């Protein structure tokens, strides 16, 4: 019976735009992609979207460290992330960024609606402030002991051990991650989302039965401990969206990050010229289904704040959250020193994407359990399942069909009942894919693969091929094997997209869920080519070694201008305003007798002359080349008496020194004496 086509919007949590994608990230994106591909095979309309989470202090500070703008950094990181996901065949319809016009407009819209509906509160709070860096410290830039479970080295917004959320001021023995200093308290006005007003709605949503049991149980604990108002603002300096009518105040990254789901979908609709789907999918009474695949570390934000924000701004809530656990490697947390902290791009340099997709899928269930990537078991399972059980089934039969029957399959099935057993399994396997019991689906498929190989073993086509007068039997046996292989690969298509493409080319037909009800009879297949290569532990060793080398390279001293000359301590605007910078014309320039470093410059400030000694001789061996050039000088620097005379200011130059000194010059049109602002 044909299913009624559903409209489904699927998202993965947004990767943060300050680091590379690693195998921990890939678990979620593979899980979601397998589910999405299955839904598409069943004829549903699926929009699969994601974006980079591109705001926050960490991005601002890292960009400063790299000597580039935050916009440049997040642009480069987004390209890298998209490349990695494409390499793993994650079939996104759109991959966007939270730093976008769509996201700004939607963030402001949701905030405005929440404010108009009375869900935004203002109050002055005491915040942790780094006295050495001169900045308020965001949650993730304070670490200390969790006030709930007493676990050490936890961030200032939530505990990675017990999952609790709290204010940074509640941390025990807090330290600034930026400088290591002990923060002090400073007052600042902040904006709060009134989460407790949605307690009744959230509890009803929890009791609806849609959420995973572990998620619902955890939410109940949070309800019992009482919901708190949520601070949604951050003080400048901050890379993000400024709050409307609140200069110097910015949306906290966790407010605009989930709105990024909406922003990415809006961007997709706009690119398609679709003016109706955004409203259709996000309106309060939408019939479309909305699913978020997320890790267990961000359940609090997605199960409480996000649905409450949507409810308070008159948008629909998620249909469900699909939560997964963490990834360990060889039974332990991913380790850079052991080479098991593996980037997605590094993996693809040593293995194909289908291998990891298969291994993760074989271990996943609908529960929030951690997944262990045991690299030795990985090699054994991929070889045993994909190579020996599935691909080998095709190679054992295709040769006879190609050589003896010109690639044409038999006109009838040798064992219709066996074929029916395979196609009847579609319901159970489909239900396993649907309910995200992926490991169960793989077990059932591999059990069928064992049956198929046992059939070939018993029929022994290599023996039949040598017996005269049994050509029809040989064709029937091998055609049966090929048809069983086709069914198996149809069931595996959501997991193994690259292998599936090769199989479709070999079988000369599309692998479709409904199509297996009609076996391939009298059908011509193409010549068999190797579909999948066996893997070995040498590849694993090379992968681990490469990961270790990447860590060494990353840990090497940073080079470049910022490494050689780090940015100085933050100053106030009032401090900066004391420095009077002026355009100056170099009227004369010459050597200083008795000094091999200095040049004597005579500067015209538009009516006033200054005499300045500058240590730029090594870069300008012919001082006459400077005459007539304009530069910038500090005009209000106290005169300095030197043995060569009095220096009445300082000219501005860049560079590390020696021959690499570069005198700064204003743009064309600037006039001597004009102030640099």
Curated annotation (Swiss-Prot):
InterPro entries: aa-tRNA-synth_I_CS, Anticodon_Met, Met-tRNA-synth_bsu_C, Met-tRNA_ligase_1, Met-tRNA_synth, Methionyl/Leucyl_tRNA_Synth, MetRS_core, MetRS_Zn. GO terms for molecular function: ATP binding; metal ion binding; methionine-tRNA ligase activity; tRNA binding. Zn(2+) binds at residues 146, 149, 159, 162. It is found in: Cytoplasm. One of its GO terms (cellular component) is cytosol. Keywords: Aminoacyl-tRNA synthetase, ATP-binding, Cytoplasm, Ligase, Metal-binding, Nucleotide-binding, Protein biosynthesis, RNA-binding, tRNA-binding, Zinc. This is Methionine--tRNA ligase. It comes from Salmonella arizonae (strain ATCC BAA-731 / CDC346-86 / RSK2980).
